[in-house]
C-alpha cells in the first residue's frame, strides 16, 4: 500500500548527494555542487505543504517534483539529469511504487524535462505512464 503524501518518506539533501555521487562514480563526470541553495530548493519543493497537507496529490506527483526540480535547478557541476532520475526512482521505491523497467521512455522523459519541454504537471502525467 502506498503512503499518503503526508506520510511519504522524503529524500534529504544528504540522500540526493549520495545518489549523485553514485551516478558520477558509475558513469563518470565531474563531482561537486554548483549551487547549494538550488540543491536545497530542489529537495525542499516536493515536501511543500499548506496547513499540514501536502501540495501534491500522491507519491507519483512527488516523485515527478523531485525529477523536475533537480533537472531544472541544475544544482550540480555535472550529472544533474542522472541525479534527478536516480532521486525519482529512489523516492518511488522507498514509497512502495513500482517503476516500470528501464526503457527509452525514461530517457525521453528526463531529457524533455531538462530541455524545458515539459512543465511539472506534464512531467507528472508522463511519469504516471511509467509507474505501476
Protein language model annotation of sequence segments:
Residues 1-132:
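FIC/Doc superfamily catalytic core
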Amino acid at each position: 500500500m502506498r503512503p499518503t503524501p503526508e506520510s511519504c518518506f522524503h529524500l534529504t539533501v544528504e540522500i540526493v548527494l549520495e545518489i549523485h555521487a553514485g551516478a558520477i562514480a558509475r558513469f563518470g563526470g565531474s563531482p561537486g555542487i554548483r549551487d547549494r541553495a538550488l540543491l536545497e530548493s530542489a529537495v525542499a519543493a516536493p515536501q511543500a505543504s499548506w496547513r499540514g497537507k501536502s501540495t501534491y496529490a500522491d507519491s507519483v506527483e512527488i516523485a515527478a517534483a523531485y525529477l523536475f526540480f533537480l533537472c531544472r535547478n541544475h544544482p550540480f557541476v555535472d550529472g544533474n539529469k542522472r541525479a534527478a532520475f536516480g532521486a525519482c526512482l529512489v523516492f518511488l521505491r522507498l514509497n512502495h511504487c513500482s517503476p516500470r523497467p528501464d526503457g527509452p521512455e525514461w530517457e525521453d522523459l528526463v531529457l524533455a524535462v531538462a530541455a524545458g519541454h515539459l512543465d511539472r504537471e506534464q512531467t507528472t502525467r508522463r511519469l504516471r505512464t511509467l509507474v505501476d
